[in-house]
Amino acid sequence: MRVENGIATLHGAPEISVLLRRSGRARRLSLRVSGLDGRVTLTMPQSLHLSTALEFLRERESWLRTAMTRLPAPCPVALGADILLRGEILRITEGCGARIHVQGSQLRVPPDPTGTRTALRVATYLKASARAALVPASEKYAAALGRPFSAITLRDTRSRWGSCTAQGRLMFSWRLIMAPPAVLQYVAAHEVAHLKYMDHSRTFWTCVAQLMPDYQTHRDWLSNNGAALHNYCFTSRPEADNG
């Protein structure tokens, strides 16, 4: 095992990098594998000696390797591959025009002789589609709540689907456009509700229910299926949109 710059590397096939994280709140050692990106984190109490944590990691290496094999394989975005858009599976195929568009059960993309631009083009298309859906959804719920927001930003976040700052700035993951439209609407309602309640109290959830009475169904969909949206692998990702 090699330890460098807060990363422990387990030798073998394949090598596994483990982020070593100290936490003042941790009372015991905890080894976790992210279902979103496969990242491995070993969390330890502040006062625990590093050698104890590394021994814990060695003892659980077999479990860790088994857990890694159970992670879903990434889905490269390329010609001939499938992708989700608004909850529907579309096949990425080559079109003859200069713009991406949906045609039946296909996502038609411009010709890409080198095979190097399709993923970025699709990601950019998804991001634009997400903005076109999230802006009016947020405006609708903000108007219903009587609380305006100051800006909307789209990012490719892995730890959360959206956020709301005290300054009224809303942030959303553009991958929400892959989910069914009602799921995207739920996240918009959720974040807009934070314009009034900056917590997850019972009052907050009552507010969400007022904006979207059947929100729980869509929240459950995201809990059960959201990780799959992160399996799609784009060779290049669009920059954050601060518009």
Please provide the spans of the model-predicted regions.
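Active-site-proximal or metal-binding-adjacent scaffold patches in catalytic folds
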Residues: 1-186, 195-243
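Walker B catalytic acidic pair
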Residues: 191
